[in-house]
Amino acid sequence: MPIIAVIDYDMGNLHSACKGLQEAGTQTIVSDRPEDLVSADAVVLPGVGAFDPAMQHLRSRQLIPVIQDILASGKPFLGICLGLQILFEGSEEGTEAGLGIIPGTVKRFQSEPGITIPHMGWNQLEYQQPDLPLWRHSPAQPWVYFVHSYYVDPVDPTVKAATVTHGTQTITAAIARDNLMAVQFHPEKSSTFGLQILANFVEQVQATLATPAV
């Protein structure tokens, strides 16, 4: 059974994500200790809240270089909500530098008639990487649950794995590149499809463990 480390940096309730991963057949460990993250088979970076405090909490725990090294190592990595946004270089929400893993910035939705900010509730995904393993056994345009006022804007459009449209604004809802996957929506709140995403991630971790190192 693979061990997945869920990074604890005081930015949200981690219980739901852990429960979903455990139901998918994995053991989870919630930790902010670098040695736990490095020794795990995969890492999940969840989070809700604001960009600057998130980066400050990671820095105070000396986790920024640890996360960067884990991503460079090829270990499966899943970011959720704020855990997607802080992978980028910075945010209009604050002044702190992000992790800088993905070139691009985090922007705020523009006000327009007929929409609410934050973007809150159920909305449909449009796949940009339809063959991504994270989407296995899933409908063509699944409904998922969002709660956010900011969205990621990657420089390289090929990292986009899915988009969503709020009013007239179509924004990035998920990214994927090599071992890194991250979603703006909350899988743990997205009913059957969300649990399937977590199960697919666990399946990828198991496949990685079964593949001999070159």
Swiss-Prot record:
Heterodimer of HisH and HisF. Pathway: Amino-acid biosynthesis; L-histidine biosynthesis; L-histidine from 5-phospho-alpha-D-ribose 1-diphosphate: step 5/9. Its EC number is 4.3.2.10, 3.5.1.2. One of its GO terms (cellular component) is cytoplasm. The keyword Transport does not apply. Residues 3-211 form the Glutamine amidotransferase type-1 domain. GO terms for biological process: L-histidine biosynthetic process. InterPro entries: Class_I_gatase-like (IPR029062), GATASE (IPR017926), Imidazole-glycPsynth_HisH (IPR010139). The active site is at C81, H186, E188. It catalyses: 5-[(5-phospho-1-deoxy-D-ribulos-1-ylimino)methylamino]-1-(5-phospho-beta-D-ribosyl)imidazole-4-carboxamide + L-glutamine = D-erythro-1-(imidazol-4-yl)glycerol 3-phosphate + 5-amino-1-(5-phospho-beta-D-ribosyl)imidazole-4-carboxamide + L-glutamate + H(+); L-glutamine + H2O = L-glutamate + NH4(+). Keywords: Amino-acid biosynthesis, Cytoplasm, Glutamine amidotransferase, Histidine biosynthesis, Hydrolase, Lyase. It comes from Acaryochloris marina (strain MBIC 11017). This is Imidazole glycerol phosphate synthase subunit HisH. Its main location: cytoplasm. It comes from the Bacteria. One of its GO terms (molecular function) is lyase activity. PROSITE patterns: GATASE_TYPE_1. IGPS catalyzes the conversion of PRFAR and glutamine to IGP, AICAR and glutamate. The HisH subunit catalyzes the hydrolysis of glutamine to glutamate and ammonia as part of the synthesis of IGP and AICAR. The resulting ammonia molecule is channeled to the active site of HisF. It is found in: Cytoplasm.
